[in-house]
């Protein structure tokens, strides 16, 4: 199977997000990479589902709360930027202060 670097990045992101979801389901607080992976993955999936950039920017702030992450992680994540594929092309989605 031949994968482009972008496809490899998406698979790595999926794996990290899946791990984060499992840890969160067990009641563990997420660290920085897990939190960013989970937010990024949800944005990519939302784009795939047909949501708009504006909808994803808003929804990106509802994925995690301070209670979901380790101490200090919310302050470390100023913004999350993801290039997502929409029906009309690839767009950069930026979520400011995603962990509230």
From Swiss-Prot:
GO terms for biological process: urea catabolic process. Pathway: Nitrogen metabolism; urea degradation; CO(2) and NH(3) from urea (urease route): step 1/1. Pfam families: Urease_gamma (PF00547). It is found in: Cytoplasm. GO terms for molecular function: nickel cation binding; urease activity. InterPro entries: Urease_gamma, Urease_gamma/gamma-beta_su, Urease_gamma_sf, Urease_subunit. Coiled coil: none annotated. It catalyses: urea + 2 H2O + H(+) = hydrogencarbonate + 2 NH4(+). HAMAP family: Urease_gamma. Heterotrimer of UreA (gamma), UreB (beta) and UreC (alpha) subunits. Three heterotrimers associate to form the active enzyme. This is Urease subunit gamma. The gene is ureA.
